[in-house]
């Protein structure tokens, strides 16, 4: 019944185009993946930036509803950019032809703040599941990123709906023999997740929603303390490992490290100094991440990977550092391996 209901609502999903169907829907991403965020709210081409930067895998941010109360997903909440092969489809096909792939990301700070994150916006669990399935089948993707922060961390009804929808999608995927993975991207402190972040994961366990990766955003701490960003990343990840041990006591430490993702904000983050992630930090984190065997290494955002605004904090288009174009991408990209 769950599968049938979910598939019925998912009828809005158009059949895959020949270009989409050429990609094996069961193909697994590399076990250890560098996948920087691409700002889909810009006019940039994912394919072009992937080619220029050398970033073969991109996380496309963000998908949200046009208004609170809606159950319709669009890119950036804009009806002019629907979930359809006509939006990003050709780019995705070219990225795949070059040996890469994409991960669509739902939510993000703006959507989580204004109630347009799909599970906060939509009151129907089957409709939320159908939205996830629509993205999966339209773009033939095997992983979805759920960026859950701000008000989405305290909206208990939305948390419950989201995790119930994840479980529905996983049941559907098993029924139709599709590989589907879910990533929760959540903020962290140096001392680990806030209780709200832990609650999101506890609720997932309650509803038997399999979360494949917990991706922590190791930036924007806003605590007015001095920070050594690479060291703080390692510390926060160690605390996350402890949380995962509590949630999944039968899993080994190796398996739990492979549930962890890290997202840095390269250069000067939104808070500004002293939260500056340097090129040296990137080298240290990439080496540490390979050593620990984490699943994902990402950064916000590909469009920021240039030295166009030295000293500027929190820009969407440059890192605030003196650097060469795509320098962080070059440091992080070797992390991708099986």
Per-segment meaning from a language model:
Residues 1-22:
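Secretory targeting and sorting signals
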């Amino acid at each position: 019944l769950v599968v049938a209901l979910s598939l019925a609502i998912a009828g809005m999903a158009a059949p895959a185009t020949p270009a989409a169907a050429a990609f094996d829907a069961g193909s697994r991403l590399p076990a250890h993946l560098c996948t920087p965020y691409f700002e889909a709210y810009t006019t940039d081409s994912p394919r072009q930036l992937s080619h220029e930067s050398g970033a073969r895998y991109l996380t496309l941010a963000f998908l949200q509803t046009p208004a609170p109360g809606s159950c319709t997903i669009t890119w950036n909440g804009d009806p002019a950019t629907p979930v359809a092969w006509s939006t990003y489809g050709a780019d995705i096909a070219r990225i795949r032809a070059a040996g890469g792939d994409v991960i669509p990301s739902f939510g993000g700070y703006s959507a989580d703040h204004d109630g347009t994150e799909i599970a906060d916006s939509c009151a129907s669990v089957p409709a939320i599941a159908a939205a996830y399935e629509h993205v999966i089948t339209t773009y033939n993707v095997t992983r979805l990123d759920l960026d859950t922060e701000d008000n989405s961390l305290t909206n208990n009804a939305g948390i419950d709906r989201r995790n119930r929808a994840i479980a529905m999608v996983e049941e559907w995927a098993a029924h139709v023999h599709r590989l589907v993975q879910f990533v929760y991207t959540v903020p962290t402190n140096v001392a680990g997740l806030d209780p709200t972040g832990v609650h999101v994961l506890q609720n997932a366990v309650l509803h038997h929603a399999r979360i494949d990766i917990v991706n922590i955003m190791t930036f924007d701490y806003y605590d007015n303390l001095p920070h050594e960003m690479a060291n703080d990343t390692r510390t926060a990840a160690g605390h996350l490992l402890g949380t995962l041990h509590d949630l999944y006591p039968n899993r080994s430490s190796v398996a739990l490290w492979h549930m962890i993702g890290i997202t840095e904000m390269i250069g000067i983050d939104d808070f500004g100094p002293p939260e500056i992630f340097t090129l040296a930090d990137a080298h240290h984190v990439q080496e540490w991440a390979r050593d620990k065997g984490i699943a994902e290494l990402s950064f916000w955002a590909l469009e920021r990977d240039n030295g166009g605004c030295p000293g500027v904090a929190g820009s969407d288009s440059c890192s605030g550092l003196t650097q060469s174009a795509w320098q962080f991408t070059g440091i992080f990209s070797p992390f991708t391996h099986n």
